[in-house]
UniProtKB/Swiss-Prot annotation:
It comes from Finegoldia magna (strain ATCC 29328 / DSM 20472 / WAL 2508). Keywords: Isomerase, Metal-binding, NAD, NADP, Nucleotide-binding, Potassium. InterPro entries: YjeF_N_dom (IPR004443), YjeF_N_dom_sf (IPR036652). Its EC number is 5.1.99.6. K(+) binds at N56, D122, S158. Binds 1 potassium ion per subunit. Gene3D superfamilies: YjeF N-terminal domain. Catalyzes the epimerization of the S- and R-forms of NAD(P)HX, a damaged form of NAD(P)H that is a result of enzymatic or heat-dependent hydration. This is a prerequisite for the S-specific NAD(P)H-hydrate dehydratase to allow the repair of both epimers of NAD(P)HX. It catalyses: (6R)-NADHX = (6S)-NADHX; (6R)-NADPHX = (6S)-NADPHX. This is NAD(P)H-hydrate epimerase. Residues 9-207 form the YjeF N-terminal domain. GO terms for molecular function: metal ion binding; NAD(P)HX epimerase activity; nucleotide binding.
Amino acid sequence: MIYVTAEQMRQIDHYTIHEIGIPSIVLMENAKAQISKHILDKNFSKAYVFASVGNNGGDGLAVARDIYNAKKYVKVYVIGKLEKASTDFKINYDILKKLDVEIEFVDENTKFDITENDLIVDSIFGTGLKRDIEGIYKGVIDMINDSQAFVVSVDMPSGLDSDENKIHNVAVKADLLVTLQLPKKSLQDYEGEYVVEPIGIPEKSIKHVLNNAS
C-alpha cells in the first residue's frame, strides 16, 4: 500500500484540479458520497457535524446534506469565520442554508447536548495541520472526546499529524476514520479503525506526483 505525505496529497489534488481539469467541487461531492455511506448505515438519533471553514469542513457540510436528505436530524457547528472560508465550503454552506439545516457558529458560550445515541462527524482539520490546537478548537475536540457519541473523522482525525504519528496538543479519538483516495503516512502506525475510499482522482495524477518525488 502507498502512503503519502500531506504535501504529496496536496500536489496530487492540485494536478487533478488544474492539469486534468476535474473541479474541486466534484472531488468534494465524490468524497461526500464515500463518507456518507459509512454514516448512513449506522443507527443514531441525531447527527452533529463539526466543521472548520476549509475544504475538510466543506466535506463535512456536504455530508450533512446527505444526512438531511436521508431524513435524519443533523446540525452543523462551524468553527471559524465565514469570511475566511474556502470557495467550496461556501458553496455547501449556502446549500445548507437554503435547505434550512441548522447551523451554529461556535464561540466560548456555545452549549452542546450530545448523547451516546448520537453521531459526530469530525471535519475540523485535515491533512494540512502543523500547529498546536488551542482555544475554541481545543475545547471542541475535548468535548467530542468526552462525549459518548460515535465519531467519524474525515480524512484525518483532527489534531493528528498526517506525516508523523504525533498529536498537535489534542486530537479527536475517532471510532472510524474515512481517509480519502490514499492513506496518509502517519496511518502506518495508526491503531484505530480506518478505511480508504476513492474520490475520483485519476491514477495519472498519483503517478505524476509520486514518480517526480525527490
